[in-house]
Amino acid sequence: MDKKINLDYLIDDIIVNSDDLTPFQCQICFNSVIDFKKETLSFDVLQCRNGHISCHECWNRQLSIKQECPSCKVKTLPSELSRNIFLENAFRALKVICPNKFKESKFQGEAVHCENGCPEILKVELLEHHLKECQYQFIKCPNNSNKCKYIIRKNQIEHHNQSVCDYSLIQCEKCSELIERKKLNKHIESECDTLMITCSKCSASIGKKLMNHHLETDCPMEEISCLYKAGGCNKRFLRSQLSQHLSENNNHIFYIQNVMDLHKLQLDECNQDYRKLEKQNRDLEKRLFYLESTVNSTVINSKPHECGGGGGGGSGNNVYKGKWVINNWDRKLREYPISKSLNSPFFQIGSSKFFIMLYPNGNNEVKGFLSIFLYKIYDRPSLVKYSLEAKNIDPTKNYKNTHTNNFINNNGNGWFKWIENKSQNGFFSNNSLTISISIKIIQDHSLVTE
């Protein structure tokens, strides 16, 4: 941002005709009643009840000493001063020259006209707006205010930048870097990246910017390590001797083999890490599928007579009756392709935990049908009779399967081909599927040690 320089001037310095100021003289100090020292001009002209005027400063000083008009001695309080609108309007119409017509500083207390200054003559009331836009106002050099002390007119800044200021940024014609004008010659002679310099190792002429790359990859006289240092060869030699060095020791076969063995070891470690991460990923996916099905995707009926989360319902602790409601069925078909299962929340009969595993698009090679299985978290062998019933919008078409199975491990039991997953068959009304669950543990095979 341009740093504007505020000029020191009075109305007497800029008035076109000095006689025009006579009606506006303060009766005490004889200066103008308008204060031109303020940043924002105030045109208020204050008078006593008899019409005598003074500047604001003199009114304040006079009334603090004695509350009377210094001209007519009439009693006057600060609150009784009134504005002289006629004089205010007359003052606004006075013609003045732009203060930027003068040089930056006065000479022996007098404003000095400058031939390069602003030629504008305008009314007093337009002066404040003009000064904000005037291209002849003085500003500090914007390039480096801590170094360049130049104060210039705003309309000369371009010339100052291009021809005068030592701190303006000039683009180097060779490397395009922006450099201060005073440093440009030194930059071109000794610092520019495109400067051709001599390599201290091989005496080749190389661009300064490319010297590091030359030493790292090309210079024949640069000392380097063997390509097979990782294989045990620790010799150093000039780059120009690389071919000769590699031909030694039976063409470095021993060191090459060491490098290959090292790479094989690293590859084996990577494979082990990969298999470990792959297993962790599978485990996490299983947990995620279960959480999705239990938290976001399913509803378990929790009426007391249908066995909530506690010790079972129905006729005793060996019986469970409930239902599993699966909402957003169309989304489940998309999210669970063939062989991907959706699991119900756990439910409990006595101390035994169960859950339902459902395949919306079928398991293995079964397509077009739902696959459904009952799983028992294995604690001890149990003979279980269970039924799973798909509820239809027409109750006469409900589909129920019943089976008795001896659960002796963690494997599930159920039907690969259960109901068709057609949206029009009445099982998926309101985009949801409801499965009634009935389970009875006929016999627990407890292990007893005496």
Curated annotation (Swiss-Prot):
Cited function: Probable adapter protein and signal transducer that links members of the tumor necrosis factor receptor family to different signaling pathways by association with the receptor cytoplasmic domain and kinases.
Keyword Cell membrane: no
Zinc finger boundaries on the chain: RING-type: 26-73
Zinc finger (TRAF-type) stretch: 129-185, 186-243
Main location: cytoplasm
Family: Belongs to the TNF receptor-associated factor family. A subfamily.
Domain free text: The MATH/TRAF domain binds to receptor cytoplasmic domains.
Originating organism: Dictyostelium discoideum (Social amoeba)
InterPro entries attached to this UniProt entry: MATH/TRAF_dom, TRAF-like, Znf_RING/FYVE/PHD, Znf_TRAF
Protein name as catalogued: TNF receptor-associated factor family protein DDB_G0273433/DDB_G0273509
Molecular function in Gene Ontology: zinc ion binding
Locations listed in the record: Cytoplasm
Keyword presence, Repeat: yes
N-terminal signal peptide: none
Coiled coil location: 257-297
Keywords from the named record: Coiled coil, Cytoplasm, Metal-binding, Repeat, Zinc, Zinc-finger
Start and end residues of each MATH domain: 319-439
A Pfam family assignment: zf-TRAF
GO cellular component: cytoplasm
